[in-house]
Amino acid sequence: IIEFLNMRVPTGDVNRKNLNLHHAVNITDAFMRAVERGEQWDLRDPNDNDVRESMPARTLWQQILEVRYRTGEQYLNFIDTANRALPHTMKAKGLKIHGSNLCNEIHLPTSEDRTAVCCLSSVNLEKYEEWKDSTLIRDLTRFLDNVLQFFIDNAGDEISRARYSATQERSLGL
């Protein structure tokens, strides 16, 4: 996690940097409780869940906040909060959010069968007065849905999990 946190900090080994990746860190309720209580926090290998190191949770939290202060990133993804807010229809299917997209705008469930897919666009709210009475939002929504349908119709078998998710959810973001 420490290397992940520091990959956007401009100092240090250039081979360990990725200044163009805009990423989030999952923050759990358990971690925040450990911060509040001044407890140790185990750093686990995501591949085998083995503890690789332990450190004070407050020290890790301070590092997260210092990197955010210096770089504006990484985004904080309060993952347990996201799962509590998951629609009941998705909870009933046993679905769970494991992360967000890189910039943390969307929270969609993922599993062995699904890879989150969402077609995103944006509008310039500074120009709201120019388009507020137009069909812009409807047209953009239709456009995004058409892009999603094009993806579904043309996605290869190597990304079948993404195609399945797009078909099941039709997630759009504007």
Predicted regions and their residues:
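Active-site cavity-forming subdomains of large catalytic enzyme subunits
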Residues: 1-130, 157-164
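A generic short alpha-helical patch detector that favors 3-5-residue windows
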Residues: 112-115, 136, 169
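Short coil-to-beta-strand
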Residues: 115-119, 142, 172
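Long hydrophobic segments that form regular secondary structure
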Residues: 130-138
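Core structural elements
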Residues: 143-153, 163-174
